[in-house]
Amino acid sequence: MLPTLGLAKTHGDEHFVEWDDFSLAQASDRKPVTRRLHIAFVAPSRTVVDEFWRAGTDSGYRDDGAPGPRPKYGDDYYGGFLLDPDGNSAEAVHHDSVSERGRIDHLWIRVADVEAAKRFYETVGPHAGFGLRRATDDRAQFVGQTGSFSVVAGTPTEQVHMAFPAPDNGTVERFHRAATEAGYRDNGAPGERPVYHAGYYSAFVLDPDGNNVEVVNHNRD
């Protein structure tokens, strides 16, 4: 369905497939399947939302909400929803405030404790390019330059890896230091990881639900 949104495959092999800012990796015993994730991709028009949903249902994927207005999210919000083979929710969305710079409009993960998750993401947000917009007892929403990210009360999303861009290596180091000094679990100290590409400089920590959160500087011109 992603080609209907203008997302071209940028890498693909038997273990890993990438479309610009979004990628899939083969699950293993060490890295189990991601569950209960919601991801919404930017659609340039309502017609493209319709095409995304139709391509998915025509291919046999499960409908999770036919294309149409969703006024509870916004007066001009128009989305269509599908379920991937692992039961994760994939949406194409168009609204007037949609970013033209990003491919992903928003991401939702479910968490065991909204307040605990909110504290974690407030800690790392200044170094990951996002900040808190609003919070209630059952949801906290963070926004960045190209989209939003929410933590929502419910059975926790499992095995998600999220990587946020950094403008320099120092930001990567500050992200890791802020998180670990606040007591969050280290999952990879700042350093270059040439296995991904030359200049790839990143660090990893785990959020309260065990999801892998990364900040990375690609060191590309």
Which residue stretches match the model-derived regions?
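Short beta->alpha transition motifs characteristic of CBS
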Residues: 81, 91-98, 197-198, 204, ...
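N-terminal beta-strand motif that seeds the catalytic metal site of vicinal oxygen chelate
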Residues: 39, 93-119, 129-131, 162, ...
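Short, flexible turn/loop "capping" segments at secondary-structure junctions
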Residues: 30-33, 99-102, 154-156
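A short, glycine/Asx- and small/polar-enriched loop/turn
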Residues: 20-23, 33, 75-77, 143-149, ...
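Short, charged/polar, Gly/Pro-enriched secondary-structure boundary elements
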Residues: 25, 30-33, 88, 147-151, ...
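Core segments of cupin and vicinal oxygen chelate
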Residues: 1-23, 108-148
